[in-house]
């Protein structure tokens, strides 16, 4: 995806996240909401995978499609909603194949997670920061990046073999 499409796909969640941050933080963090959305996303993913006709490739993505996928990503602001799963659902509904849907979810993860982290740092009490916390955070970020880089290839291979069914079952049990 080009930078323009990444910005378009990231804008809705950043916009709605900024507007509804306080409401979400104070009103939607109950165990009931989290459980309901954990199960609901699994069931929606099941239906989309079962009924989807997924032929489009990531190279076919339009600005409108990436904006719609970005709007789907906004649903992930609700606790219990997997950001990756909701993007995959949106992409599958628009006719993209599994591999492209996963790649779109992974590409859109970076700006959103980075900006969310920066916003949380902005809200953080800086008196609590010390060199130990900073060094451990940097190590965690580097390790996460490296592990993610190697897992992505396996994940795409695995999903193409099994589909999303193991993850649906996991989410239903978890919910």
Predicted region positions:
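Multi-pass membrane proteins that catalyze or facilitate reactions on polyprenyl-/lipid-phosphate substrates
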Residues: 1-175
